[in-house]
Regions:
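Conserved catalytic core of sirtuin-type NAD+-dependent deacylases
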Residues: 1-128
Length: 128
């Protein structure tokens, strides 16, 4: 195991640029519900086609807006965790060397201080 860690450290030290791929697992540690967990996931309570489609928005815009407002409110109660903070600190110490590519829409990487974040699915903090 130590050899593996030493090799990883060496790769990171010599890399010109590092891309970190992030998903639901990192934010689950902060208490953000995932979409896929069978018992507690967001889709355990709602069907995607009822809230997360253009057709749903056209039929029941108030329901969709309310659902997103509820999600935004729940995110206001959570904080970035050690994983988010470690990535932000790495970026601070090594400017221009780290990009976080995330599927998450919670904005916790940005709240932790990460600047170079590509949010593949957008952000609940921004309406488009």
């Amino acid at each position: 195991m130590e050899d593996l860690l030493a090799r990883a450290r060496q790769c990171l030290q010599h890399a010109a640029h590092i891309a970190v791929l992030s998903g639901a697992g990192i934010s689950a540690e902060s208490g953000v519900p995932t979409f896929r967990d069978a018992q507690t996931g967001l889709w355990a309570r709602f069907r995607p086609e009822e809230l997360a489609t253009e057709d749903a928005f056209r039929r029941h815009p108030e329901r969709v807006w309310d659902w997103y407002a509820e999600r935004r409110a729940s995110l206001a109660a959570v904080q970035p965790n050690a994983g988010h903070l470690a990535l932000a600190e790495f970026e601070r110490r090594h400017p221009g060397r780290l990009t976080v590519i995330t599927q998450n829409v919670d904005g916790l990487h940005q709240r932790a201080g990460s600047q170079d974040v590509l949010a593949l699915h957008g952000s609940l903090a921004e309406d488009r």
